[in-house]
Each structure stands twice: as structure tokens, then as C-alpha cells.
Amino acid sequence: MISRCRFSFVFSVVSVFGLLSLVNVLADNSSLGSLQGDACVPVVDNGNVRFRGSLQNSFHKFSTEKLGHVVFLGGSITEMEGYRPRVVEWLTKRFPETQFTFTNAGIASTCSHTGAFRLERDVLNHGPVDLLLVEFAVNDDQDAHHSADDCLRGMEGIIRHVRRYNSRSDIVMIDFVNPEMLATAQLGNTQLSVAQHERVARHYEISSIDLPAELADRIAAGSITWETFGGTHPGPLGNQMAADLVAEVLSAGWSVAAASAESVGAHLEPAEPLIATCFDHGKFVPAESIRPGDGWQHGIPEWKSIAGSQRERFAGKAFFHCTQPESTLSFQFSGQAVGAYVLAGPDAGQLEVQIDDGSWNTVELYHAYSGGLHYPRTVMFATGLSAGNHEVKVRLAKTHPEKSKGTAARILNFAVSE
């Protein structure tokens, strides 16, 4: 068990990369002091960098078993050569005898919904996760424009699914920052996606880093600017700052683990989720389960004849696509939510969707970023369905959004959650 002591002090943390940060730790009900003896152990807790729960399992795995599977899950901030390789370098130096497997599960533009549905394919199929570093606050905000409930559905779904697959998985959540999120933090408030993801972190006792608030504090102190941080996709200084904060919270957690007699074990899951319709059983529907009608094809599109750029990761992929209005496909599934992971380009149209012989509803594929790019996004057909089996019919609409140049649908995967 962790001892708590009623003592206030300021201690300095020198990161492994040489950046010095002063962290005020007030040993009340949320933070601990650092004293000689066994009464207290040091913990990072400055209001923006929050150590919660336990990192005992990853510490034991890395230091004793000398094996470790570390997963980085998120959008382009994760996919790019940014904070992630810096953390990889730090971990390999911190545990030089440990055989690590590092999984880069970042996909640019994707939100927490896509993350929840692709989790099985991109993360869990690579083996049990010892340490997960996850970020989706920026894309849930600026790309998906998620509601409060939708922010929870994706992020909570990820956490619950990871922990159901391996109840010993340690998790750290990093909330990155864009200009609007920074401006909100500078006013003393919290952007919706950050606030909702932090609710998930508190509910599951997951350590987290509120980068918008931390950056706002450092800008106010005159130690950094938005420009030197590097923007939404951070530059070298911003990525170093994020990596240092990750190193600090991990080091704090592992200091607790090293000083504790607590053994490794399962993380306790709350009896109830924050939102019952979270995507904690998210997965993609196998292509062979889809029944395409005339007009639908499964294969690689003739990209050279299609306007708009596409990212390399999608260029050679086969998937269902159609440009012929009123063409229909269908499939059956068991679960409470259904949608599609799509590429929405300059000619993206609309889908008409019917579930269980109900009314036909229109689903927009075109996105604000579709003008010159076949943009990856997840669109939901329905959430909160009754448990059990359902049938979905999908029809390409004759109409299309005003800004779109066509009626195309390019569906990478259909997605469901039980």
C-alpha cells in the first residue's frame, strides 16, 4: 500500500533528457511527500501531470522478467517521428537488459472511435499489452468534433477492451494540444475532449498528462511559446517536452512500485462504465461477412483515375467501394453499435442506412478535410441498439453534399461493438 503523509514541499525533477522542471507536491489526499524512511515516496502531481493507480505491473515486467510490449496508440501525433521515438529511446536506456516490443499504432486523422474499433487488429493481435500510451484528445476535438458522450464512447471503450484482454496492462493517457485547446486552458478552462478523457482516467485510476494546461502554465511563466513548442504537430522542443513528461510520470510510478511491497496483479475495473454504450467490444467486420449487391466492388480502386491524394498506408488496400447510386449491400452483426471506417475524398457522397427494417437514415461521408484528400474517418450508423442480432442495409444515395464532386463511398471496414 502507498503511505500518505501530511507534508508540503517543492522538489525538482531532472528528466533524462536534461530538462529541469519544478513540481509542487502538496501531500494532501492526492499527493505524497518525499522523506527519508518508509513513510513517503515521491510522486509527480503538479495538477497537470497526474499519477494515479499503479504502474507496478510494467515495472515488474521490465525490471524482473526483462520483457515488455509497449504500445503507442493515437493519431498523427503518435504516428509521426515525434514524442514516441523519444520515449522508446528513454525506455531502452532505462531498462538496457529488457527485450522490448514497441508497437506504433498511430494513424493520422483518426479519433478515439476509430481507435476503439481497430484496437483488436492494430494492438491486441500483437500480444498482451504491458504498457499503453494513448492520445486522442486533439483528433476527438478538431477532426471528429465529438460530443461529450462520443468522447467517452471511444476512449472508455479502448481502456475497458485493453484491460479485458489483459487485466494487468498499465496505461498512461496523454492529452496533446491544438491552438483552441491551448486558448481554453489559458482561460483556466478545459476543452471538452480533454475533460471527458480525464473523466475516463479518473474512473479507471489511470495516470494522465494534461498538456494544454501544462503548456499554458509554461507559456505564462515565459519558458516557452506556442511557436517554439512547434504547434499541433509538435516540433523538436514540444516533442521533447511531451516525452519528458511521460518519463516523469513513469519514473514516479516506478519509484512507488520499487518502494512498495505490493505484488503484481490485475487492475480493478469499476463495476459500471461511465457510459453504457462505450465501444469496449469494438471490432471490424470481416469482408467475407458482407453481402454486396450490384455496383459494389471489393478491391483496390483505380487511384490514378480518382481525384485527390491518398496516404500511402491505404494505397494498396482492398476494400468495398461504389460510385453507382442506389447500389446496396448488407450484413448481419451482434451488438449495440455499428458504423464504418471510410476514406472520404473530394467525391465522397452519402449513405442511406436501414437497421432491422427500420427507417432509412442518411449518413454523410464528406468531411471538412475531404477537399483534396481521401480522409480516413469513422462514421456511426447507430449506437445504443438492443443487445442481440441485427441486420444492416447500406445504400449509396443519389444525392451528395454541396461541396462534394460525386457520390462515391469507399469503406475500409465496417465496424461494430457488442
Language model regions located:
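Alpha-helical scaffolding segments of alpha/beta enzyme cores, especially the outer helices
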Residues: E89, D150-R153, G157-R164, Q196-R199
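Structural recognition of the beta-strand scaffold that forms the well-ordered cores
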Residues: H69-L73, T101-G106, D130-F136, D170-D175, ...
